[in-house]
Amino acid sequence: MDDLPLNVGLPIIGVMLVLIVAILCYLAYHWHDTFKLVRMFLSYRWLIRCCELYGEYERRFADLSSLGLGAVRRESDRRYRFSERPDEILVRWEEVSSQCSYASSRITDRRAGSSSSSSVHVANQRNSVPPPDMAVTAPLTDVDLLKPVTGSATQFTTVAMVHYHQEYT
């Protein structure tokens, strides 16, 4: 059997190399998540945990719109944006112990000369969205948002930081 001609074999090799490089770049960029997936795969309950974690992730993403700041668009695993505002939510997913206590949300006034901060529950932010010169750091403390998936051995805390930007003229 003759070898493939050069004009057929070269594009195939090129496509394979591009795919391999793309996979390696993805793994390098998401090394932390990849490491977690490898550890989960090596555990004996990897399939059950994978389903639980996916369900938890999707449910929490759906609940982000309950902040009352408009529709939310997912840009990556950790970055979300509101469709009608220039605000952004950064979400940190991390395992927490059962003894963990959840702090209430904080609104911090970032105006010049002001250092005041007040505690606000996320549920109350629906009707009291701060003006554009305020910066919000809001750990989601709603009971539904922090409730783990039924039967899940892992809990997650979702931390949402909403940044308000205003150009001064």
Swiss-Prot record:
GO terms for cellular component: host cell Golgi membrane; membrane. One of its GO terms (biological process) is positive regulation of receptor signaling pathway via JAK-STAT. Residues 109-133 are annotated as: Disordered. The keyword Nucleotidyltransferase does not apply. Keywords: Host Golgi apparatus, Host membrane, Host-virus interaction, Membrane, Transmembrane, Transmembrane helix. The keyword Phosphoprotein does not apply. GO terms for molecular function: molecular adaptor activity. The chain crosses the membrane at residues 8-28. Its main location: host cell. It comes from the Viruses. Interacts with host TNFR1. Interacts with host MRP1. Interacts with host UAF1/WDR48. Interacts with host STING1. Plays an important role in the establishment of latent viral infection. Modulates the expression of several host cell surface receptors such as TNFR1, CD36 or the MRP1 transporter during productive infection. For instance, associates with host MRP1 and induces its lysosomal degradation. Plays an inhibitory role in the host cGAS/STING/TBK1 pathway and upstream of IRF3 phosphorylation and NF-kappa-B leading to inhibition of interferon beta production during both lytic and latent infections. This is Protein UL138. The lineage of its organism: Viruses, Duplodnaviria, Heunggongvirae, Peploviricota, Herviviricetes.
